Amino acid sequence: MPHFIAECTENIREQADLPGLFSKVNEALTATGIFPPGGIRSRAHWLDTWRMADGKRDYAFVHMTLKIGAGRSLESRQAVGEALFTLIKTHFAPLMENRYLALSFEIEELHPTLNFKQNNVHALFK
């Protein structure tokens, strides 16, 4: 953990530069010092079927979720959320200037015992 997941409408695939966004997000998460680098993952789910608002325009959206393990303070979660949303808005600013685009972001804290993981990548970062 953490996992950064972007749900994106297909009509912005060419312009969204999600590899660039993921690079920035992973760097920012590592820089906080509160997440183990070996657990950071970013991925996209492209949506080929959606409807927004009245459906009359070529609207687009990106909804992003950061899933994190339990145990971090509200203050640290708030700081991470604000920093990431600033980064997200900056990344998508050029696209937002040229089309209708909705951005949303949430942090989801997983249950402390009802999630299960195995990862040997952590050893590379110790």
Language model features with spans:
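Short, low-complexity, polybasic intrinsically disordered segments
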Residues: 114-126
